[in-house]
Amino acid sequence: MTTFYTVVSWLVILGYWVLIAGVTLRILMKRRAVPSAMAWLLIIYILPMVGIIAYLSVGELHLGKRRAERARAMWPSTAKWLNDLKACKHIFAQENSSVASSLFKLCERRQGIAGVKGNQLQLLTDSDDVMQALIRDIQLARHNIEMVFYIWQPGGMADQVAESLMAAARRGIHCRLMLDSAGSVAFFRSPWAAMMRNAGIEVVEALKVNLMRVFLRRMDLRQHRKMVMIDNYIAYTGSMNMVDPRFFKQDAGVGQWVDLMARMEGPVATAMGIVYSCDWEIETGKRILPPPPDVNIMPFEQASGHTIHTIASGPGFPEDLIHQALLTATYAAREYLIMTTPYFVPSDDLLHAICTAAQRGVDVSIILPRKNDSLLVGWASRAFFSELLAAGVKIYQFEGGLLHTKSVLVDGELSLVGTVNLDMRSLWLNFEITLVIDDTGFGADLAAVQDDYISRSRLLDARLWVKRPLWQRITERLFYFFSPLL
């Protein structure tokens, strides 16, 4: 019997080390950033079983077999649609400003189409204004409405949007609604999902959370886009989820969420429509390619129209393009660079680009919320402050609530607005969208919004920062080491 237990013990020990060696080899063979690989290896060797389970669950980008097959299957039709769209030469911009030229060339070469011109844009900074404008557009819709949100939280004006959407479906408008399973869990547990389906709305629960399939697909891969398209002509996107800030996370102790949305009219709605159609097909298997822009309803094809490139991440879209876009925009800055984000855990490349911009004389400002709803990200963000301050970057801590806006402004002319946080999840993992806008008028509007944020912020004093307690420094460094995994 003793021999039996000895053999079993040795087999368990052997299996244990074979498993660790196998996972280690897999991490080393994967093409990933060195800090990320080192962080995973540290977890696995300090807490082997916890680390192995965590890595197999969320360490690799598993979309799931069915979705991966759909992503491959949709590409031929999507490629044909893009080629057909190129025939609409009147919607594409031929020239860009000097500060935007490199970024627009990057987007065109990687995505296959140029930026679209002739768009009208309106920045909306108040949640009531956003929802009232959205309700008005829904009421005037004539053909179709498509929506996707990470979070839909019932309550307040969000319920009024839901009522208007159901009314549109009842009068024959084709309505589609896609919501992230994890982010919108409160919605799917409420009566609203059934009510909408009964009204004729196609409601899809994207990337369903299923613990039984935790090793087959990443559960933390989330649909983070926020988009609305109406009649293939009107579009919305930005940082705002479908929530009323007066009812959302009131017990988090961070104040009301502060967001930014862009309302657009023009061919950009078609560019955003193909993003939505790809997401819809991956999730449902149904193909809903949008029609080309209607030249008869494009009154803004003049020099006054804004030129926009739409960048999306996720299956079917160029890998790493959003990260490349941020790097290109940062290196293009000559006068000033203002970044606004709720979560700041940059890649080494992006951190280096930001610091280098400041060191070559660019006036660089980063606006972050002073209070954050994510304890882990909040501490990890602080770990980068010393290097940023030493390079001459100004860090503003917003005190008027949880600043949730995601925006970048370069030299008053090149703007990036969308759903992308400056953290690893947005840069490498989630389904995101950002607009790249080449226009001084829009840049002035965004600058006014950012100036308002700065007026409600406190500038971080580098002299006081270096005097913070030792325990804070230790905590920051601990979270910094694991920041590639956040």
Curated annotation (Swiss-Prot):
It is a multi-pass membrane protein. Keywords: Cell inner membrane, Cell membrane, Lipid biosynthesis, Lipid metabolism, Membrane, Phospholipid biosynthesis, Phospholipid metabolism, Repeat, Transferase, Transmembrane, Transmembrane helix. One of its GO terms (cellular component) is plasma membrane. Its EC number is 2.7.8.-. It catalyses: 2 a 1,2-diacyl-sn-glycero-3-phospho-(1'-sn-glycerol) = a cardiolipin + glycerol. Pfam families: PLDc_2, PLDc_N. It comes from the Bacteria. InterPro entries: Cardiolipin_synthase, CL_synthase_A, CLS_N, PLD-like_dom, PLipase_D/transphosphatidylase. The active site is at H224, K226, D231, H404, K406, D411. GO terms for molecular function: cardiolipin synthase activity. The chain crosses the membrane at residues 3-23, 38-58. Residues 219-246, 399-426 form the PLD phosphodiesterase domain. The keyword Cell inner membrane applies. It is found in: Cell inner membrane. Belongs to the phospholipase D family. Cardiolipin synthase subfamily. ClsA sub-subfamily. HAMAP family: Cardiolipin_synth_ClsA. Catalyzes the reversible phosphatidyl group transfer from one phosphatidylglycerol molecule to another to form cardiolipin (CL) (diphosphatidylglycerol) and glycerol. This is Cardiolipin synthase A. The gene is clsA.
